Amino acid sequence: MSRKCAVTGKGVQTGNNVSHANNKSRRRWLPNLQETSLLSDTLGRMVRLRLSTNGIRTIEHKGGLDAALLDIPDARLNQDARRVKKQIQKAIEAKKATA
């Protein structure tokens, strides 16, 4: 599993630690990723995604998992999030067809 947020795409960054004497040593900055379970109202079940804390805030700001995934373009989502988005879209279409 990659160290990338499923929603925001935030990942590992690299650079240098620079000392007072200007000595440089390579280092990595890891994103604050959390394995979260979020409720999908449309699917009626919990969905597990690996999200950054910023990604969790984005989902809450947009009004929940379903609204956020439908609003975010596919290019920004990882494979797991795209799969959930497609399931949500199919469930919405099925509800419209039966109604």
Curated annotation (Swiss-Prot):
Pfam families linked: Ribosomal_L28
Compositionally biased tracts (Polar residues): 11-22
Location of the region described as Disordered in the Swiss-Prot/TrEMBL record: 1-25
GO molecular function per UniProt: structural constituent of ribosome
Gene name as annotated: rpmB
Keywords: Ribonucleoprotein, Ribosomal protein
Protein name (Swiss-Prot/TrEMBL): Large ribosomal subunit protein bL28
Domain of life: Bacteria
A GO cellular component annotation in the UniProt record: ribosome
HAMAP family membership: Ribosomal_bL28
Family, per entry: Belongs to the bacterial ribosomal protein bL28 family.
SUPFAM superfamilies noted in UniProt: L28p-like (SSF143800)
Biological process according to GO: translation
